[in-house]
Amino acid sequence: MPDYIPDAQVVFDPASNSGIQMDTAPYHVNLYRKTGYMLGASTEVPELTYGTAGSMRKYIPNTMTLMQHILGNGVTEVEHFVNWLAYIYQNKRKTMTAWIFTGVPGTGKGLFVHKILKPLFGEQQVPMRSLENIEEQFNLYMRTALFLVVDEFRMGDSGNTGRMADKLKHQVTEPTLTIRAMRTNQIELPSFCNFIFLTNRADAVKIEEGDRRYNVAPRQESKLETEHPDFIAKLADVQAEL
């Protein structure tokens, strides 16, 4: 007779400190995984409030250089984005808004995702997809997403602009999402996902008047290596600052 395999409730709950509990029933498996940075967070850094993000340069100069560049050097936008990230990091909840980074190729948008966002929040919890991937039928990767980064995005590239606009608005703001995996029934689960759109196009998203779902950073027209020629050599310093 084969070994007995107990049933367990499988969830993704970033707000819970419980992980895998298979000692006593009811059995429970939480798919959320804290990163090493979350587990070893320093308590000696002074508390910052909205309006003081610029003082972070004292502690993370290279990270701030990269963020300021991809945000088009907008002072207000940097302040708001840092606050947005901090809220997600501290609360693991949806913000109900998305960010759009626009600029010429080589501004460092991808570097930010791979060198800062993914290490801080977890590789599995920060999937990066193209628009075509979002439109495909199966989206199991969204089950454990704190962020979805949409690369080279332009809404006009969709076969049906209106349908895609409605779909994105729904996903940015709705507290639940429908997960579709191969050979299983679709299920509706709580959504913890926040969206970042990366694009080289200035007309990436059609924003209707009064729509407050999108934060749009000033467009960056200069490559990162042009404005900061020595930055690539400092990538190790960026990760050391986290």
PLM-predicted stretches and their roles:
Residues 20-153, 162-164, 215-218:
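P-loop NTPase catalytic core of nucleic-acid-dependent motor ATPases
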Residues 163-188:
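Conserved catalytic/switch belt of AAA+ P-loop NTPases
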Residues 138-143, 180-198:
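AAA+/SF3 P-loop NTPase mechanochemical coupling elements
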Residues 146-172, 204-211:
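Conserved AAA+/SF3 P-loop NTPase catalytic/coupling segment centered on the Walker-B
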Residues 1-29:
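Long, basic/Gly/Ser/Thr-rich N-terminal segments
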Residues 189-192, 207-242:
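Phosphate-sensing "switch" segment of ASCE/P-loop ATPases
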Residues 154, 175-179, 196-201:
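Conserved catalytic/coupling elements of P-loop NTPase cores
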Residues 154-155, 200-204, 220-225:
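Conserved nucleotide-binding/hydrolysis micro-motifs of P-loop NTPases
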